[in-house]
């Protein structure tokens, strides 16, 4: 029976239903004034492939088993619906890292690379986060890295990517917490969260990177039949159980907030989701000391109808998944 369901899902993924142009997937009621990202129509990949089904890497959500999907699935880079339904079965996409190794942080000469001790050798690694990260990228810190065995063939300059760090929290309940520091992970986790029913309302037609006026929002979807936008911000800064954003001034972040506020004033449902890339967080607040303009913009957006959400994450060495609500203090 299970094999029949999986085959049906695979067949549906390759049907003409999944061959439509991105414009046909825009939720009803979206008066988009910009252009969809280039390349989506020709380069879009189907949700699943027969090989993935036969190997057991795609399962209906009713099967409580971890999925073994590559972290950068083609789905993440097109605007096709994240949910493929066949009867009551639905494909679930869960991000997962492969070839994880551990290392010890030595130094970070610039935003993009770090020197890490791996198996006794100092190795240059790519840092998948351009933030400052000064509070946990300290000499001797224990890091998680993803090894890329085909780095040379892929044209990569480094064979390792730093994706996580263990942070010691002296005097706090979680004395050693695992923090995911991959800046690409929050958007993927947010899309999965929406597709899995993260909002209490009925969400359909989830899209990535939709252009509206002169803006591009991380997520667009239909909520109870109403068009909605969502901006996603990954949070790695934490002190004594309080998460904060940003860790450095971000004019781009202020711009995103004001654009989302404009959409809310025009009648769209608008959300900002702060994805806290760790567990054990008591509260979230904008980092007013670092960027007061960001804090002011966030409060103004909230007063204008933008819904401010914060969620912590279950983080393992191989996965990150959005979990529980966190109290937002503006």
Language-model region placement:
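Nucleic-acid nuclease catalytic cores
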Residues: 241-251, 258-290, 312
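Conserved catalytic cores of phosphodiester-cleaving nucleases, focusing on short active-site segments
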Residues: 103, 217-246, 260
């Amino acid at each position: 029976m299970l094999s029949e369901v999986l085959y049906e899902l695979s067949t549906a993924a390759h049907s003409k239903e999944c061959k439509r142009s991105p414009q046909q997937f825009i939720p009803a009621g979206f008066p988009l004034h910009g252009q969809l990202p280039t390349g989506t129509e020709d380069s879009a990949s189907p949700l699943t492939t027969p090989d993935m089904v036969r190997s057991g890497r795609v399962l209906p959500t009713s099967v409580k088993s971890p999925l073994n999907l590559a972290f950068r699935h083609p789905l993440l880079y097109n605007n096709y619906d994240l949910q493929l339904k066949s009867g009551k079965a639905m494909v679930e996409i869960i991000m997962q890292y492969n070839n994880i190794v551990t290392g010890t942080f030595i130094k970070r000469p610039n935003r993009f690379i770090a020197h890490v001790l791996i198996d006794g050798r100092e190795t240059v690694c790519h840092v998948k986060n351009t933030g400052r990260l000064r509070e946990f990228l300290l000499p001797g810190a224990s890091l998680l890295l993803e090894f890329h065995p085909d780095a040379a063939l892929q044209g990569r300059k480094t064979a390792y990517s730093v994706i996580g760090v263990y942070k010691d929290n002296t005097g706090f309940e979680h004395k050693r917490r695992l923090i995911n520091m991959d800046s690409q992970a929050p958007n993927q986790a947010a899309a999965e969260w929406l597709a899995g029913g993260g909002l209490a309302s009925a969400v359909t037609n989830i899209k990535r990177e939709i252009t509206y006026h002169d803006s591009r929002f991380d997520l667009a979807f239909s909520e109870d039949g109403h068009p909605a936008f969502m901006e996603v911000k990954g949070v790695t800064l934490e002190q004594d159980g309080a998460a904060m954003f940003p860790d450095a001034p971000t004019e781009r972040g202020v711009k995103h907030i004001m654009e989302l506020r404009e959409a809310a004033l025009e009648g769209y449902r608008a959300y900002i989701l702060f994805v806290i890339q760790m567990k054990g967080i008591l509260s979230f607040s904008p980092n007013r000391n670092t960027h007061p303009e960001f804090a002011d913009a966030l409060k103004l957006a909230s007063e204008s109808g933008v819904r401010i959400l914060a969620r912590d994450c279950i983080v393992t060495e191989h996965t990150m998944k959005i979990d529980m609500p966190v109290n937002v203090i503006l």
